[in-house]
């Protein structure tokens, strides 16, 4: 029944790993096959967006019961590339889910720039899809 001051997580981003990685094929000897963590339907990394967000909230809601009052929950995430008809702002979707947890308040974000990554214009010269060099560090505090 120990309580914690901080919960820190970098969850899988829904079914992102299950998608073909055409832009990464040169790094992987022309292998663009999906690289799922597991085959389990219970794995967050195998879930469609809405199911992923709901299950992530349920997991973090359960974890929040072990968080001390005034304790912090920090979630690292990266947005998906925009698709036709979808903005794919995962960080905003995660914020909207976590604030549904009783007592959890959104306190802001920090941007982490991954300096180990190189900027690469995927799709050039036919289209321009910039890879992302940053992640969002979302900060929440248990107030109630």
Label the predicted regions.
Residues 1-144:
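Class I S-adenosyl-L-methionine-dependent methyltransferase catalytic core
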């Amino acid at each position: 029944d120990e309580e914690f001051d901080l919960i820190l997580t970098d969850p899988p981003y829904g079914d992102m790993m299950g998608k073909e990685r055409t832009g990464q094929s040169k790094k992987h000897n022309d292998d663009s096959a999906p690289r799922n963590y597991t085959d389990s339907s219970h794995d967050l990394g195998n879930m469609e967006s809405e199911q992923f967000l709901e299950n992530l909230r349920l997991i973090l809601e359960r974890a929040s019961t072990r968080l001390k009052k005034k304790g912090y929950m920090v979630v690292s995430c990266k947005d998906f590339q925009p698709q036709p008809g979808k903005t794919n702002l995962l960080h905003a979707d995660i914020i909207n889910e976590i604030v549904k947890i009783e007592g959890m308040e959104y306190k802001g974000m920090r941007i982490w720039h991954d300096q180990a990554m190189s900027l690469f214009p995927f799709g050039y010269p036919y289209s321009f899809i910039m890879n992302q060099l940053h992640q969002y560090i979302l900060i929440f505090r248990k107030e109630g």
